[in-house]
């Protein structure tokens, strides 16, 4: 299943939320005060329990069955295998030249995009080693780096940057990887990775005329990380 895309004008409703410190522990409060949890308390961990349970139920036999169903469509199988972390299947398809490493789905996502947004570093490494295009863009202009940064897959993002990914690439909505990380409440590691990069251009604006810092102030508890680049002159060489 493909990850949900970000809408450029999407803004969370923070009017009724209550801010708590990073150290706030709901479980500890539950132990000491029973059911008296303050209204508006929000967990910093975002997850889908139904999806997690579904994933736990899928064993190797299920995956092999899915692969068998797609065997006559190796391109579809490669895209699926990259997303599902089926490294051996990815390696087999590429070694047999059964599918092209930069094959695309209907939204122009490549196997590298899918592995990047799913956080599968070993698959990402294999795809790049086999010639995957780190600059490939989807119909909305997303690169694999955008996909990794949106979902806080920091190790994947770091690997892509080491292999010439454009840290300032902009989508059709003018979103950079930094914009996407800034809108994610769980993105501290990825924000630090991007902001510490000498080539970052934090002043870039999306089509709503917002910088990544603007988005972070509105949506993230880690907006203070942008102090890393405040008042600094970009040291990247002219293009």
Please give the residue ranges for each predicted region.
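Intrinsically disordered, low-complexity regulatory regions that flank or link repeat-based scaffolds
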Residues: 1-72, 230-239
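Ankyrin repeat start-site detector
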Residues: 73, 106-107, 139-140, 172-173, ...
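Ankyrin repeat domain, specifically the short helix-to-loop turn at the C-terminus of the second helix
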Residues: 94-99, 125-132, 158-165, 192-200, ...
């Amino acid at each position: 299943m493909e990850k949900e895309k970000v809408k450029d004008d999407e803004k969370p409703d923070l009017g009724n939320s209550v801010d708590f410190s990073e150290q706030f522990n709901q479980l500890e409060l539950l132990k000491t005060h029973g059911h008296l949890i303050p209204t508006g308390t929000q967990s910093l961990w975002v997850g889908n329990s139904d999806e997690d349970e579904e994933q736990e139920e899928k064993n190797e036999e299920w995956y092999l069955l899915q692969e068998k169903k797609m065997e006559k469509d190796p391109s579809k199988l490669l895209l699926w295998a990259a997303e599902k972390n089926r490294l051996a299947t990815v390696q087999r398809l590429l070694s047999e030249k059964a599918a092209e490493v930069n094959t695309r789905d209907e939204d122009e996502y490549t196997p590298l995009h899918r592995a990047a947004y799913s956080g599968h570093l070993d698959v990402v490494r294999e795809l790049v080693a086999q010639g995957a295009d780190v600059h490939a863009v989807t119909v909305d202009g997303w690169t694999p780096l955008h996909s990794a940064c949106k979902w806080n897959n920091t190790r994947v993002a770091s690997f892509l940057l080491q292999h010439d990914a454009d840290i300032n690439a902009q989508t059709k909505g003018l979103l950079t990887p930094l914009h996407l990380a800034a809108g994610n409440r769980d993105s501290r590691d990825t924000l630090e990775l991007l902001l510490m990069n000498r080539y970052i251009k934090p002043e870039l604006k999306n089509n709503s005329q917002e910088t990544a810092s603007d988005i972070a102030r509105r949506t993230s508890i880690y907006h203070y990380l942008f102090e890393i680049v405040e008042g600094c002159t970009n040291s990247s060489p002219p293009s």
